[in-house]
From Swiss-Prot:
<keyword id="KW-0687">Ribonucleoprotein</keyword>
<dbReference type="GO" id="GO:0015935">
    <property type="term" value="C:small ribosomal subunit"/>
</dbReference>
<keyword id="KW-0694">RNA-binding</keyword>
<dbReference type="GO" id="GO:0000049">
    <property type="term" value="F:tRNA binding"/>
</dbReference>
<dbReference type="InterPro" id="IPR023798">
    <property type="entry name" value="Ribosomal_uS7_dom"/>
</dbReference>
<dbReference type="GO" id="GO:0006412">
    <property type="term" value="P:translation"/>
</dbReference>
<protein>
    <recommendedName>
        <fullName>Small ribosomal subunit protein uS7</fullName>
    </recommendedName>
</protein>
<keyword id="KW-0820">tRNA-binding</keyword>
<comment type="subunit">
    <text>Part of the 30S ribosomal subunit. Contacts proteins S9 and S11.</text>
</comment>
<dbReference type="InterPro" id="IPR020606">
    <property type="entry name" value="Ribosomal_uS7_CS"/>
</dbReference>
<keyword id="KW-0689">Ribosomal protein</keyword>
<keyword id="KW-0699">rRNA-binding</keyword>
<dbReference type="InterPro" id="IPR036823">
    <property type="entry name" value="Ribosomal_uS7_dom_sf"/>
</dbReference>
<dbReference type="GO" id="GO:0003735">
    <property type="term" value="F:structural constituent of ribosome"/>
</dbReference>
<dbReference type="InterPro" id="IPR000235">
    <property type="entry name" value="Ribosomal_uS7"/>
</dbReference>
<dbReference type="GO" id="GO:0019843">
    <property type="term" value="F:rRNA binding"/>
</dbReference>
<dbReference type="InterPro" id="IPR005717">
    <property type="entry name" value="Ribosomal_uS7_bac/org-type"/>
</dbReference>
Length: 156
């Protein structure tokens, strides 16, 4: 890691169907081995399934799901003397989004539906209704931060 300059953030282009930057980031996270067209078909297929099931805008369901999964606080390890403390810290907005996307995808991959499109749509629907393993992951992180609130004065 360079000590002089931190890498500058790259501009992410909005996706062609919805014109949304977050959807593009989501696609890029789903993508394996540079196969963007496969990732695109999975995401768009999942959003089409959501639209068919709920009769409401798939973008609103997606945004609600992401909002319900994004953590506001997390714990980070801090060594003080000989002891390591789990110190609760607030999560930056870019990291919140990245963690939310990562947790949604991990939860979708762990589901039992047949295709990834079905798994992703089911997980997004669950997350938008505050259910599912991605939301559980966020609650676990928040519980951990709440349990270690006593060490919040070690914040840096």
């Amino acid at each position: 890691m360079s000590r002089r300059h931190s890498a500058e953030k790259r501009e992410v282009l909005p996706d062609p169907k919805f014109g949304n930057v977050v959807i593009t980031k989501f696609m890029n996270s789903i993508m394996y081995a540079g196969k963007k067209s496969v990732a695109e078909s999975i995401v768009y297929g999942a959003l089409d399934l959501i639209e068919a099931k709920t009769k409401q805008g798939p973008l609103t369901v997606f945004e609600q799901a992401l909002e319900n999964v994004m953590p506001t606080i997390e714990v980070r390890s801090r060594r003080v003397g000989g002891a390591t403390y789990q110190v609760p810290v607030e999560v930056r907005s870019t990291r919140r989004q990245a963690l939310g996307i990562r947790w949604l995808i991990t939860a979708a991959r762990g589901r039992n539906e047949k295709t990834m499109t079905e798994r992703l749509s089911a997980e997004l629907l669950d997350a938008s209704n505050n259910r599912g393993s991605a939301v559980k992951k966020r609650e676990d992180v928040h519980k951990m931060a709440e349990a270690n609130r006593a060490f919040s004065h070690y914040r840096w």
